Amino acid sequence: MIPRPSSRLAAALPAFFAALVAAISATSPGEPARASWRDVAPVQATLRAGGIDEASFDVYVARVGEENVQRVREGDLDHLVYYLLQSSRISSAAAIEPAVSARRLVESLDTDRRAAYLRGDRGAAPPVPPEVTARIAALLKAAQAPRGDARLTYFGALLDAAYADPRTRAAGLATEYLRVMRFLYEKEFVAQREASPAAAVAELYRRRGLSTDTAVEAGYVVHLGLGVLKALEPARRVRRVLIVGPGLDLAPRTGLDESAAPESYQPWAVLDSVLSSGLGTPGDLEIVAADINPRVVAHLARAREQPPRLRVASSLHESPSLSLSPEYRDYVDRFGGALSAGTAAPARDLGDGQRGKTVAVSAQAARALRATPLDIVTQRLDGERFDLIIATNILPYFDDPQLALAVANIAAMVTPGGAFLHNEQRPIIGDLAAAMGLPLQQSRHAVIATVTGAKAPLYDSVFLHVRPAAAP
């Protein structure tokens, strides 16, 4: 028999739970909710062009949601493959450059078998090279005793989630290696022979796993976009920011840096830029980081309670043939000024032409961060409104109908007078955003670095859409 509470306690319980619910509601983002066909009325033409109508809409959204869960798994395993090929922590053997491995693997096949393998015929897959098999074994051994290595701990947890039976892990990773190599070969070698290599690569990205990749360079174009926003309206104030897909720096395809723990830079970069530009003020700013990957969300939730010490470093290394633009160098030099309790350390040469610094995030800055799960294609945060929504380097993963849903969900969360900032260059996004009441206000292209002999500099773009203050 369950004991009954005393009458005093019984009387207090409703008030206690009401206060608890109110506190959670005040500090947590709204629950993810799916849009209805009516909610996406302005972009229904794009959906119909993709074969989706009112009768099939709910089934389509559910299917995309399921596919995105699988794409998250594949994206995580992509990073795991890149890690096991390059890590010096798990093996003293020479690191294997993924694209080089892909080329050797595929071009060892005869013409017919190569074509079958690239079509996805598992029966045509080549054997996994011995040096890769050795690295798979080294990873599985190292993951059993990570010894405080945060990146290895992350991948060990991923192995547990992906392969409940440890006996299946070596074979499972071999299969993932072959899948990743097929994608890399198509991207780096097959697509480059097409009439429009960029379009061919873009099509591949709409089918690949959802990557958590993030880098300091992504923060630079957001910083520039916020500068444009401030210049257009100096009195503008930003109190609530939603970052869609902040990501986590785990294991890039090239240049794995194991000198620092995995980190999600974008929330801190956005916080720093909003404060340093004067768009927001400490204590009156909330950053909501929403990601489809639950491991990214968990990482950022911990960061709120345990403010990180960021190793901020450009992924580009200066050399006689590569020069960082003065504006980008200045951004790296100034990064973190609004994040630290004291004065942020100056940037310096970290060796091998890499520029960076260490920034200790203050407890006050960390308290501005919230993390929540969200699939922006199929979901929106119910009842939430934001002064600014940022989505960089995630929109290329979506085809046109998926992009229409993502833009509709973003638009539903932009407050009147609010802004949407992204770096997706497909023209259709301008049409979709305008249809949802977010017309393009300005765009800017920014040079990050110049490369001797290259046809064009390394650059990125930023596009700023603003909803009229009187919502249509």
Name these PLM-found stretches.
Residues A12-S25:
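Bacterial N-terminal signal peptides
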Residues D39, V43-A55, V59-A195, G247-R370, ...:
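Class I S-adenosyl-L-methionine-dependent methyltransferase module
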Residues V180-V238, L256-A260:
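Class I SAM-dependent methyltransferase Rossmann-like catalytic core
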Residues R311-L316, P320, V332, D431-H465:
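Conserved Class I S-adenosyl-L-methionine
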Residues V377-I389:
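A short acidic, Gly/Pro-enriched loop at the edge of an enzyme's catalytic core
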Residues D387-P401:
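A short SAM/SAH-binding and catalytic strip from SAM-dependent methyltransferases
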Residues A404-P416:
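A short glycine-rich, Lys/Arg-flanked "PGG" loop and its adjoining helix->strand segment in the class I
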Residues P416-Q425:
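Conserved beta-strand signature within the Rossmann-like core of class I S-adenosyl-L-methionine
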